A protein has these predicted regions:
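Hydrolase active-site cap/lid region
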Residues: 189-243
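Short substrate-entry loop that stabilizes the transition state in hydrolases
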Residues: 89-94, 99-141, 209-210
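Alpha/beta-hydrolase fold nucleophile elbow
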Residues: 170-181
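N-terminal cap/lid segment of alpha/beta-hydrolase-fold proteins
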Residues: 46-91
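Short beta-strand/loop motif that positions the catalytic acidic residue
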Residues: 262, 268-270, 274
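Alpha/beta-hydrolase active-site loop
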Residues: 148-168
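N-terminal targeting or regulatory segments adjacent to alpha/beta-hydrolase or S9 domains
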Residues: 2-5, 11-64
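C-terminal catalytic histidine-bearing segment of alpha/beta-hydrolase fold enzymes
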Residues: 276, 283-327
Length: 327
């Protein structure tokens, strides 16, 4: 039986050499290599996670408790927002959802801010939820190198999954993932790396393969992304060539190439007026899922934006119902 969450400051002493939030050292940037993003490489790594350590007890929700917790990912202390339903867990433990947030400037990110209403909807429905900061965000250790050309964030969410599986109140066979925008990219990757994940919901996800991301994603990057992080894309193309010149390499990095390995269905949501993520990403993934013989639900909201503001209640209700049916 896994120990319950216990407040501790021990890790603060052993892991005190953290880079400031959002920092990128020359050494970390130099060591980043797009080949580390291959699905095959990710499957060779271990993701042991750790016990969840309470850092702060927050005001409770309507029918659940809230905590800032931390867990370990490659020796880094990663903070996360955890919710736990009130009452006695069902036989085998509560179902759980790892909650993957979209891009927020790491230096302004706070564990307890953003996505509050989203996470609350799943928490009220009887799920344990865990929203990871990702490394280099807020008070979490490590360096924020982005999701697309460095593997750190993927590693962090997979260690979040393992940390939930270690917790005695969670049913390790009933864990799913929710992801928004960049978090949708992480969700799809995590699910093809770990087929024990039973279901995924992706809102406005960056879910194109690398050919699509490099060729068909023409939005202007946020000014808050450091130039040196943006240059990881140019570094990758300079070293490995374009997707047209080296298709085998880039297919190996794309979760879309491994959809047959998914351990459960996907539910996809997007608005047609999304100014950040092209509708094309959503449509192609839905088509690829059907071609792979995998179950997928696709919801397109006419005129809605990146956050599905006009249809928030509907999208949340559909997402909660999906997880209730699949976990």
């Amino acid at each position: 039986m896994t120990r319950p969450l216990v407040p501790s400051l021990a890790l603060l002493g052993t892991l005190s050499l953290a880079a400031p939030a959002g920092a990128q050292s020359a050494a970390a940037l130099a060591s980043a290599d797009a080949a580390q993003m291959s699905i095959a490489a990710a499957r060779q790594k271990s993701y042991p996670g750790s016990a969840l350590t309470v850092r702060q007890t927050l005001a409770p929700g309507m029918n659940y408790r809230r905590f800032v917790v931390s867990y370990l990912s490659e020796g880094l202390r990663i903070n996360a927002l955890l919710t736990v339903p009130n009452g006695t867990p069902p036989k085998g433990g509560w179902p759980a959802i790892v909650f993957n947030h979209g891009y927020i400037p790491p230096q302004v990110y706070r564990t307890t801010e953003r996505y509050v209403a989203y996470q609350d909807a799943f928490a009220r429905a009887g799920f344990v939820t865990l929203k990871s900061d990702y490394r280099g965000h807020g008070g979490s250790q490590g360096e924020a190198l982005g999701a697309y050309f460095a593997p750190g964030y993927t590693t962090d969410v997979l260690n979040a999954v393992s940390s939930l599986r270690r917790d005695g109140r969670v049913n390790g066979d009933r864990i799913g993932m929710w992801g928004h925008s960049m978090g949708g990219f992480l969700t799809l990757r995590a699910m093809v790396i770990d087929p024990r994940l039973k279901a995924g919901v992706i809102w406005a996800g960056v879910v194109g393969d690398y050919s699509t991301i490099l060729n068909d994603w023409n939005n202007v990057p946020p000014a808050s992304i450091p130039r040196r992080v943006l240059e990881l894309r140019q570094k990758a193309v300079a070293k490995y060539g374009t997707p047209e010149a080296n298709p085998t390499f880039w297919r190996g990095l794309s979760a879309n190439s491994y959809l047959k390995d998914l351990g459960g269905p996907l539910q996809l949501h997007i608005g047609t007026a999304d100014a950040d993520v092209p509708l094309l990403f959503h449509e192609r993934l839905a088509s690829q899922m059907r071609a792979a013989g995998k179950p997928v639900q696709s919801y397109v909201y006419p005129g809605d934006n990146h956050d599905l503001t006009r249809n928030l209640g509907t999208a949340l209700a559909r997402s909660v119902a999906f997880f209730k049916a699949r976990l």
